[in-house]
Amino acid sequence: MEKVGVLVVSYGAREVAMVDAFTRSQSYDVEVYVADKQRNPFNVKRAVKHVVIPDLNVEEICKFAEVNKDRIDFGIVGPEKPIIEGVRDLVEKRTGIPIICPKREYAIEASKVQQRLLFQEIVPEVNPRFKIFYPSDYKNIDETRKTVYSWLDELENKAVVKPDKPAAGKGVGV
């Protein structure tokens, strides 16, 4: 059976599922090299090498890939933070290991505003109604509040509010 080395950049359950699927392959002898946000017992048990990088720092992920580059055939990244910070660009440039995730310039999760504007341009039928509230457009917080509440009334309070920047799943209000 052909041996394949896979770098997995992990934050949580999604990447655990990837590690599980890779290590259960019946077609390949897969060895996983995991760069994890925290010590995940499942990943530790299945990884040939496991390293904890608490902030998923792109430079540290790249160093881990460099040390193991002769045994890694490709990598896959789930968490948005290292994608937004250009992990693919850096690892591919310095190691030659192909990485499955968007390049930094295509990391649409970096800005919800840019994401919505892009969707409006290419697939408007799947893009929900949205409005962007720029603080600089308002004289004070009261004017901002009044405008936001007016928009919410128009939507009958059926709305989702998101910050422009990534919030690791913690920034959404319904």
Segments the model singles out, each with a brief description of its role:
Residues 1-104:
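ATP-binding N-terminal substructure of ATP-dependent carboxylate-amine bond-forming enzymes
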Residues 105-109:
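Long, charge-dense
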Residues 8-10, 110-174:
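Active-site nucleotide/adenylate-binding loops and adjacent lid/helix of ATP-dependent enzymes
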